[in-house]
Amino acid sequence: MDGYDGKFMIIDLDFINILPQALLNRGIFLSDKIGVYEIGWKFDDVIKVLYIIKEKEMTVLGGDVYELNGDEIIITYDSWSFSGSNFIKSFEKASKYINNYYKNNGDNFIYTIIVSNATK
């Protein structure tokens, strides 16, 4: 969807264009589970996704955390956001949030990422 200030938001299937198929296959498509058009990843994979986004010089606008309980996905209402266009600072904020969340809460969570790519 075209957004604001010449930016493009990447959600759900748009990740196909920037992520390796193996990483996409490990993602959890939330539209199937809870009707949210995002892909969630466990900790190790979401860190890989962040590095790919950084390499593409895309800005992480924020993300959400969901708890995994067997096949059930539970909304935690935990999230982070970033305002600005510095892709390095956005990467650092997302990485710090996710790493801290993982250290404090364990491995039964997935993380979604909302990304904006300023047109060049």
Positions of predicted regions on the chain:
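Surface-exposed beta-strand edges and flanking loops
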Residues: 13, 32, 62-67, 77-79, ...
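Alpha-helix boundary/N-cap detector
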Residues: 10, 14, 37-44, 48, ...
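Conserved NAD+-utilizing ADP-ribose enzyme module
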Residues: 17-18, 35, 39-48, 52-63, ...
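Amphipathic protein-protein interaction modules
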Residues: 51-106
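Long, contiguous N-terminal structural blocks used for assembly/anchoring
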Residues: 1-40
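Acidic, proline/glycine-rich low-complexity IDRs
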Residues: 98-120
